[in-house]
């Protein structure tokens, strides 16, 4: 009996040691997350809270950024393995210039962002704005930049584009009159709309060419992807799992409302009215041909990428 106990204890120690080793050897991945708090970038925070990535042996260290420019630079420099929510146009332009990045997932197809004016603004719609007015976007090459360029190219907007950073900072600038037409991403701005302090000037999906485009993507540092591909694949397994959970478990909205410091009503309104699950599909990137034409027109690209370059650049789905 004593001998059996000794054997059992020995096995327990061995298994405990193995478990401890596995915990210690979880792959640590650094992420740069654009516009933290947006529904389409919240897979990182929410997934960490429910242990989705840990189940696949991945430990995340996330840094919030103000948008595409900061996110992309962190990945290019190698200070982040993955960038979340990068404007597709900006990513294409950077790759064409030799940046060591690869697209590893779609982040947002279509666009839930909307542009606002103060309630007392004389601007009622796109045709009312002149070259004396300003219109906000986050950073160069971002999805909001693509939208503003689309407003100008396809809807005839004449306002002057100006980079204003994230939605919270932009709302402050719009409410103080420092920019005429601001932008925001739901649920930020819902309360001001309900209180009658702002009006919707235009929606991103008003631009016909953008409705079916993947306007934001997730990118990886090319060297990190090459050296640690298995860890990247396991991260994506967790990422997909989180998206499924966000649309199937009522607790997801409660957790998001807590994370975003908003009401459950606003969280539900945002998801159900602005973000169909298909918009967050990580395993497709749509509209690349049109985006490359846009990139050439606005001088992000000298010429479209070749089919060979696209195959190297877009590694979706990552499995």
Which role fits each region the language model picked out?
Residues 55, 206-211, 276-284:
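Short, solvent-exposed loop/beta-turn-alpha elements that line the ligand-binding surface or hinge
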Residues 295-319:
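Conserved C-terminal helix/tail region of periplasmic/extracytoplasmic solute-binding proteins
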Residues 18-25:
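Sec/Tat signal peptide C-region and signal peptidase I cleavage site
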Residues 89, 168-258:
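Pocket-lining segment of extracytoplasmic ligand-binding domains
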Residues 1-4:
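N-terminal secretory signal peptides that target proteins for export/translocation
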Residues 7-17:
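Bacterial N-terminal signal peptides
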Residues 26-157, 161-176, 180-186, 197-204, ...:
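Short, glycine-/small- and polar/acidic-enriched structural segments
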Residues 226-302:
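Secondary-structure end/capping motifs
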């Amino acid at each position: 009996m004593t001998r059996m106990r000794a054997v059992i204890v020995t096995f327990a120690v061995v298994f405990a040691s193995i478990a401890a080793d596995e915990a210690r050897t979880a792959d640590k991945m650094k992420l740069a997350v654009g516009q933290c708090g947006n529904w389409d970038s919240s897979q990182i925070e929410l997934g960490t809270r429910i242990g989705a990535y840990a189940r696949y042996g991945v430990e995340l260290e996330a840094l919030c950024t103000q948008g595409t420019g900061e996110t992309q630079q962190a990945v290019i420099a190698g200070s982040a393995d993955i960038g979340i929510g990068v404007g597709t146009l900006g990513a294409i332009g950077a790759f064409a210039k030799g940046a060591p990045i690869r697209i590893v997932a779609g982040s947002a197809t279509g666009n839930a962002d909307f542009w606002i004016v103060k309630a007392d603004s004389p601007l009622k719609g796109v045709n009312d704005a002149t070259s004396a007015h300003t219109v906000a976007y986050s950073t160069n090459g971002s999805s909001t930049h693509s939208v503003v360029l689309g407003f100008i190219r396809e809807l005839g907007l004449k306002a002057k584009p100006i980079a204003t950073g994230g939605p919270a900072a932009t709302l402050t600038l719009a409410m103080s009159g420092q920019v005429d037409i601001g932008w925001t991403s739901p649920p930020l701005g819902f309360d001001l709309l309900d209180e009658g302090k702002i009006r919707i000037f235009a929606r991103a999906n008003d631009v016909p060419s953008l409705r079916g485009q993947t306007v934001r993507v997730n990118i990886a540092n090319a060297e990190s992807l090459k050296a640690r591909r298995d860890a990247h694949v396991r991260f994506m397994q967790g990422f997909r799992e989180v998206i499924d959970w966000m649309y199937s478990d009522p607790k997801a909205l409660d957790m998001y409302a807590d994370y975003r410091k908003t009401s459950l009503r606003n969280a539900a309104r945002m998801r159900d009215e602005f973000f169909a699950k298909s918009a967050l599909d990580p395993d497709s990137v749509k509209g690349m041909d049109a985006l490359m034409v846009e990139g050439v027109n606005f001088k992000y690209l000298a010429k479209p990428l070749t089919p060979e370059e696209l195959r190297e650049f877009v590694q979706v789905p990552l499995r």
